[in-house]
Amino acid sequence: LLLVITLFTSYVIKVKDILQKSLREKHLEILAYTDNLTGLGNRQFLQRKLNILDLTREKDYAVIFIDINKLKYANDTFGHEAGDQLIQMVATAIKEAMEGNSDGFAGRNGGDEFICVAIPSSRVSSITKNIRYNLERQRNQQRPPFPVGVSIGVATYREFLAGTSDSARGIVYSSQVIKLADERMYEDKMAQRKGPGDMR
């Protein structure tokens, strides 16, 4: 009986050690793919998820490229803490807008840039609308209102199929979709600068 108890205790300890090691590894993996300031995925997380999109040949997704307007101005004028707050406000707006899109993902691409992927692409309109709405709501809650604006560009996988030289094989890479979304974000930024003056 003593031998059985000893063996069972040894087994329990071994299982516990394995579980603890697994949890530690999982925690380290989460840290490796998380942006410390925003809690969103970081660039490595985005690259990993985008690689999966390419490998699985997912064909119904949209890329939302987001850039914070005049972050450098905010840093220089109000200090880097204010700039960090601005980044966090945008990240919160993105998180809230992405709720319910369990197949999609979002992350901070670095600096003032964020990338969201909407799956299916039909969700993209509501997501971009909610990002702007969430930002406006956060801004109005600040006293005084905190100046925050973003430029947004959108591109979908499907719009490439007719124009790519590899369209017969249906080969489109996420980097192509991101590049187009980035270009459209810049167009949005230029259009905003022609409008009424604000934090653009």
What are these regions (language model features)?
Residues F45, P147-I152:
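Beta-strand residues that line the small-molecule/cofactor-binding core
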Residues I18-K21, L71, P196:
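Sensory-module boundary signal marking interfaces of small helical input modules
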